[in-house]
Amino acid sequence: MAFHIPEVSPAAGPPARTDFDLLEAFRQRYPFPLDPFQEEAIRHILAGRSVIVSAPTGAGKTLVAEFAIYRTLAAQRRLAYTTPLKALSNQKYADFCRQYGPEFVGILTGDVKVNPRAPILVMTTEILRNLFYTDPMEDLATVVLDECHYMGDEGRGTVWEELIITCPKTVQLVALSATVQNIAEIADWIGQTHGPIHAVHHPVRPVPLQTLLCDQEGRIATVEGAGRRAAEPPRGRPHGWRDRDRRRHGGDFRRRPVHPSRLIPELVERGWVPTLYFIFSRAGCERALEFYLERGPSLLDPRRAAEVEEVIAHALRDYPSITPESELNALVFRGLRRGVGVHHAGMLPALKRLTEVLFERGLVKVVFATETMSLGIHMPAKSVVIQGLRKRSDAGFRTLTMNEITQMGGRAGRRGIDLEGKCVIGLDTPEGAEEARALLARPPEPIESRFRIGYSSAALLLMTYKDPPMIRSVIESSFGQYQNRRRIRELEARRGELALRQAQAEGFQSPCCELPTLMRYRSQRAILERERQRLPGFSGASRRQRKAQAAAWSLESLADVRERVTALEAALAQMPCHRCPHRGPYEARLKRSRKLVEAMEGHRRAQEELEGSYWEQFLRVVAVLGHFGYVKDGALTPEGRLIGGLRHDNELLVARAVFSGAFDGLKGSEAAALLSCLTEEPRETARDAAKAFLRAQGHLRRRLQSLELLAGEVERVQDRYKVPLSFSLHSALMAATARWAAGEEDWAGLVDSAYGGHEGDLIRAFRRLIDLGRQLVDSPDLPERLRPVFVDAVAGLDRGIVLESALI
């Protein structure tokens, strides 16, 4: 169906009457009135002002972005819609194609390029960041930054800051953020960096949320009442549940929350489904589904079960790759047919999408999901269960943040359907209620900058700005430096306080002792203490000092030491300060003054580090590039320009490999296998398959060894210049990549024999590898002899189930 909106002249901006018509036409698209915060944000957009909207999950932030799209199309201009995740970009692309027509919408995600000249272009933040540096979009009017709170993400936050810094000042920004503590600070930084921006903060949820706690036995209570009185008992135990099941699925439960099979019947009986059940591991999600299918009843009546069969049949026709060949796929299909699903990043994209569709239609009542489902995927529920307050991280287990709880809990409560959403938090110890109450009483955490200078960022800055002061100005426009300036102001204020206290301490004068006299007394007393420590049995001597005493006695008589101690004591007693009643307070003031001076010096050093930290970081990164000859006289060589064009965390090692000859003479499938060593290492693989592959492929084993030498050199140079950037080198994907790129057709057999992990992980690894290969092919600085090799590598990978998953 053709998309129609009132036309607006882009030349001078829409007149007031047209603004009114445009807004009224937009209102007619929705069966409900706009909320006041949406109206406020829309009026800023109509006035051409940038806006940042902070509101809870499900409050309707996306509607503000949809108006920006509506207005952009009316003005016949272009809009870039950025998301932090490829899956979210794919979802937005599909949504916008349905709303506005595929002719108006395009997508750029690195491995996928569809309709790149469209007026509405969905893309990841990395893509738009690079476009701003190298090839700005023509006629770009607006940039939407969806999930803007991702600016605080450890791995991806830098890109968000770079995008805002490099965005042309003539482009309107529409930023959408979850509720965070420092939205005003973020808005102030954007205002200083890009231009005036108006913050619209709406903390109220459209559907009220009740947070409850569930103990290890399945008793649900209010946050205030949990653990303080007898909680409400569960209304029924799942059929077949026995004490031996407790032992099998959780031991004595000292550190385990209630098992899902115990809680789900309670949720069903209370009418709190559909439910998103968050479990912080893939294996935990799969075990929960498997155990429920063993013991729990179906959650579907016959009519709903028939609808599920119809949707599954349709999905199998569209995506034949999701047939239940693997053990996980078979488990998922069994669950869907009984109204229970699972959702995590290791699943096939098409199978995840099928689960989402069934959940949205109310045909799946419970989905066991990892927390990735809380990041923008549209799956509103009646209730949310968070299984425990602790999750595993790289450094061990840690407590959830308030932002994480808010993000997950925010999925509960469907607008226009539920009067109230329910967020049930599982307690994993009998004493967990107090910990939960303390955590839930905290405000949302502030967004902290994760800005860092990588090799690609440094190369792009050198390509774009020739003048070092300009580069420094751009770097110090970062949110990280903005927050550093706040810390510097705090340090300056603290130094001022310390200086005042130090002056007061220095100003104290003893009525009888002058400072030089007191200092001579203290010096003599210190000498006396050292001599006393040499005497046997001195209580103040340490173990090391006592060992030193024993050695000294063999060289010097004990009598000599005692004689010196006696003489020093007598001399000290004759000094005027020895019996002075004012000496103690004077010494205390003097000691306090010295400590204050040391503290001020520490604050001064910290301030200096904050003032130049990012610029120093940039200089060190450029020094590494210069060491390898990728920067000469302040200009990039072809190798450096190639690095600048890569959206990849391993960009330096990739460039070293490309220009070292590591890929010379290889076929496309072999080049793909070797390039896979430079991508992110997968979570779980069949290590034996990789070893067997390398034993059989001696020439690739030698190429890998050459990469290991290059990696060792990079590590040594980074250590020398104090550049703590990580890089990756592994062989885990080589066997699967080589076989698939060479034309292997048996996907299930490939996953089982050459990979050993989750199918979804392998799909994602191949999509990333395709993206990296295309970046190399598109680079004008790639050696021409390698271009056809990487073209063949990409073509061999981008087919079958891997291609089918590109836009899911």
Predicted regions: what they are:
Residues 1-51, 208, 300-337, 597:
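Helicase-associated low-complexity/disordered flanking segments
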Residues 43-51, 61-77, 161-166:
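Walker A/P-loop NTP-binding motif
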Residues 76-130, 188:
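Conserved nucleic-acid-binding Ia/Ib motif block in the N-terminal RecA-like helicase ATPase lobe
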Residues 82, 97-106, 278, 282-366, ...:
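Conserved C-terminal RecA-like helicase domain
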Residues 125-127, 134-174:
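SF2 helicase catalytic motif II
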Residues 165, 172-174, 179-291, 341:
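Conserved interdomain linker/interface between the two RecA-like ATPase lobes of SF2 helicase motors
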Residues 337, 341, 360-364, 445, ...:
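Non-catalytic terminal extensions of ATP-dependent helicases
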Residues 379, 383-393, 398-440:
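Conserved segment of the helicase C-terminal RecA-like domain
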